[in-house]
Design a protein with these regions (language model features):
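Glycine-rich beta-alpha junction loops
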Residues: 141-143, 164-168, 274
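Internal active-site segments that recognize and position negatively charged phosphoryl groups
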Residues: 151-180
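Active-site glycine-rich loop that binds ribose-phosphate moieties when present
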Residues: 123, 140-159, 185-186
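A glycine-rich beta-to-alpha transition motif near the start of alpha/beta enzyme domains, typified by
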Residues: 1-131, 170-288
Length: 288
C-alpha cells in the first residue's frame, strides 16, 4: 500500500490515495497503520476518495458539490465527523498532487462541505511542489450547545460544550497560564455520558491574554495529541465567551505550534500550517 505522511501542528496523519473508492479500510487496519511501534504511526488516517464513490455510503457526500471526500478515521479505527488539522493536510495534499489546481476549492466531509484556501510556501517563497503550506478552512458555525463538566484525575472542570461538526467540551480555567497548562497531568477524562452519549474531545485552556490562549487536548478515539483543529475552534469560542466577547480572532497555542481562529456569528475560519513529511510503501500485510 502506497502512503504519504503529513501533519498540521504535529497532529499527524497517514494519507491513503483511493480515488475510485476501492479500498475498504477496516477499524483493525486503521489501528495497524496508526500503531507507532508496529505500523506507520499517526493520530489518524485520511483516505482520499472521489466524492462520487462515497454517495451511497455517506449522506453528506450525496449532497456535496466538492470533487473529493475526506474519509477520516481516528487512530482507534473509529469514524469521525470532522478533523480540522486533518482537513488542512488533506487539502494541502490535493493541491500538491494537482488533484485541485486552484488555490481555492471545497472538500466534502461527514460534517458537510468545507471551503479551502491553500497558500504554498517553502524557505525560498512560493513553490508549486512545496512540502509545506498555510491552509485556511471555513469550519462553519461553532455552536455552543450548553454547559458540562469533566473529571481529569482528581480535578473537576466545567466548560462550554461546543459543536464544530464533532463534539467538544472546551474548558477555560480562570487564573491559569501557559505554565499550568504545560504542567497539567492530562489523562482520559470522565465526561457526562448523558450530555455526550458518543463521547467528546476535551480541551483545557487559559483565558485570553493579548488575543492568545494556550491549550491542550484529549481527543476522543485517540488520546492526548499535540494539536486538534476543531478543538482550537471550540477553545477560541470558549475563550472569547469567557472574556465577554462573541466574535474575534484568537491565536491558539498548542504543544505542536500555533494556529489562528477567527470566530464570527456566521462561521469560523481555522488557519494554520500543513507539512507533508514522507511518502512510502507499507509492506506489512494488514489484518482483515
Amino acid at each position: 500500500m502506497d502512503f504519504a505522511k503529513g501533519h498540521g501542528t504535529h497532529n499527524d496523519f497517514v494519507i491513503i490515495d483511493d480515488p475510485n473508492g476501492q479500498r475498504d479500510l477496516t477499524a483493525q487496519q486503521v489501528r495497524a497503520l496508526c500503531d507507532r511501534t508496529g505500523g506507520i504511526g499517526a493520530d489518524g488516517v485520511l483516505r482520499v476518495v472521489r466524492t462520487e464513490h462515497m454517495t451511497a455510503e455517506v449522506e453528506q457526500a450525496a449532497e456535496s458539490h466538492a470533487n473529493w471526500f475526506m474519509d477520516y478515521r481516528n487512530a482507534d479505527g473509529s469514524i469521525a465527523e470532522m478533523c480540522g488539522n486533518g482537513t488542512r493536510v488533506f487539502a494541502h495534499w490535493l493541491h500538491r498532487q494537482g488533484y485541485e489546481a486552484a488555490s481555492r476549492f471545497s472538500i466534502a466531509t461527514r460534517a458537510g462541505d468545507k471551503a479551502i484556501t491553500v497558500a504554498d510556501t517553502d524557505d525560498a517563497g512560493r513553490a508549486p511542489d512545496s512540502q509545506q503550506a498555510v491552509v485556511s478552512v471555513e469550519m462553519g458555525v461553532a455552536e455552543v450547545t450548553g454547559l458540562s463538566t469533566a473529571q481529569v484525575g482528581s480535578e473537576n472542570f466545567a466548560g462550554l460544550a461546543v459543536d464544530v461538526g464533532n463534539p467538544h467540551l472546551a474548558v477555560v480555567v480562570p487564573g491559569w497560564g501557559a505554565e499550568e497548562i504545560a504542567n497539567l497531568h492530562l489523562t482520559a477524562p470522565r465526561l457526562d455520558d448523558e450530555f455526550f452519549p458518543a463521547g467528546a474531545n476535551l480541551e483545557i485552556a487559559t483565558p485570553l491574554v493579548a488575543g492568545t490562549t494556550h491549550m491542550r487536548v484529549f481527543e476522543r478515539g485517540v488520546g492526548e495529541t499535540k494539536s486538534c483543529g476543531t478543538g482550537t475552534v471550540a477553545t477560541a469560542c470558549a475563550a472569547l465567551a469567557e472574556a465577554g466577547l462573541g466574535e474575534g480572532t484568537v491565536q491558539v497555542v498548542v504543544p505542536g505550534g500555533t494556529v489562528e481562529v477567527e470566530i464570527r456569528s456566521n462561521g469560523a475560519t481555522l488557519t494554520g500550517p500543513s507539512r507533508i513529511v514522507a511518502r512510502g510503501t507499507f509492506s506489512v500485510e494488514l489484518p482483515a
